[in-house]
């Protein structure tokens, strides 16, 4: 079996080492590598990846973009995929984020930094967990407003949107904070 992780940048990913060791220890005949795809080359490159790999993980900045290229198994408004196998797209981010929190009380409001696929997964879990108030910060307000609109239409909770510059003010009143952005990743800001 041939597997990989796609994203940009992706050279910092520990996934190839982790999965390589796991496959070795479990006696699984599989390989796992990192494939860096430039955002401008995504449409051409994703076809090649789908043809040459049995499955792949998806990281920034492609978790939302990949949906148009696979058979999506995610329910709206999650609209982000982090795993593709046999050309079917799945999202395990929300479970990975939420499982450790199931036994705990989540204090509100929850501040989320970022408005990409990871933020969608966090909001998806928080909504299922009964959280009523989310404060969403992003550098591009239109992306945050889109998420607000898509999730609030389902009812049961409120998302307030703030520019990234409001981070200190919003953090001062937030009881829980989640960084779902690329900020701090590998010591770089990625967009």
Positions of PLM-derived features:
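Rossmann-like adenosine-cofactor binding region
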Residues: 157-191
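Glycine-rich adenosine-cofactor-binding loop
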Residues: 7, 93-94, 101, 107-131, ...
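Short, conserved SAM-binding/catalytic segment
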Residues: 146-157
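Short acidic/polar active-site loop segments enriched in Thr and Asp
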Residues: 54, 132, 157
